[in-house]
């Protein structure tokens, strides 16, 4: 996102006790649902009620995305034993619910955590960095084509930065949530960072926990009122 002054920042909170009860209930039924999946399912449902959250800016014009996808990073172990990260992009469809969303995420994570597996995004990045002089030149060309709306569909499908939502679960590495900028490259309009649980100081029930969600939003894709309605739907 080239206009950094067009970003808004807010911290939302998810009641961990409510989420935990639901997770435990489903676990007794034989279904394992992570916290991040619950957040994503709530976000997706709220988007269906407030579709403008899925718009993006390209070349100073507002566009409505014709699909919904989410990008996130997972840790994996390479074939040589080194720890590494890989980006995943998962597409949701109108008929998806918490269970189909959970299944899609589980399948994507399982496939991309295989040591010998490089997803298409990994392969694209490996190609770029295979020739020392190529990355800078090619990235410059790709960014220019992106700004002009000339980027081929194949590259957009490979890019985790062309997404409805980018989310990171820092609680998984016992880290506080952060405000992560929306990327200069791509069409990410909202970035959500989940942090490690904190005491529920808002209600004064310090023995109960909340999950902080640090949110960075492109203010150009919808009005403040529309953002407020969207986050009310998420809650």
Describe the residue ranges of each PLM region.
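C-terminal catalytic/motor cores of large multi-domain enzyme assemblies
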Residues: 1-235
């Amino acid at each position: 996102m080239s206009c950094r002054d067009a970003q808004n920042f807010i911290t939302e909170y998810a009641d961990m006790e409510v989420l935990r009860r639901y997770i435990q209930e489903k676990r007794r039924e034989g279904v394992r649902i992570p916290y991040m999946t619950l957040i994503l399912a709530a976000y997706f449902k709220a988007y269906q009620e407030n579709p403008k959250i899925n718009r993006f800016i390209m070349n100073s014009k507002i566009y409505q995305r014709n699909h919904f996808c989410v990008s996130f990073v997972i840790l994996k172990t390479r074939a040589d034993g080194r720890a590494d990260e890989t980006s995943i992009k998962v597409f949701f469809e109108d008929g998806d619910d918490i269970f189909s969303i959970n299944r899609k995420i589980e399948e994507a994570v399982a496939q991309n955590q295989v040591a010998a597996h490089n997803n298409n995004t990994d392969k694209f990045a490996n190609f770029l960095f295979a020739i020392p002089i190529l990355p800078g030149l090619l990235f410059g060309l790709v960014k220019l084509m992106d700004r002009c709306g000339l980027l081929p569909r194949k590259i957009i499908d490979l890019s985790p930065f062309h997404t409805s939502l980018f989310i990171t679960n820092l609680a998984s590495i016992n880290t506080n949530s952060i405000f992560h900028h929306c990327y200069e490259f791509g069409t990410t309009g909202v970035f959500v960072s989940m942090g490690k649980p904190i005491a529920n100081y808002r209600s004064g029930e310090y023995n109960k926990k909340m999950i902080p969600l640090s949110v960075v939003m492109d203010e150009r894709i919808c009005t403040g009122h529309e953002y407020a309605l969207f986050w009310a739907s998420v809650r």
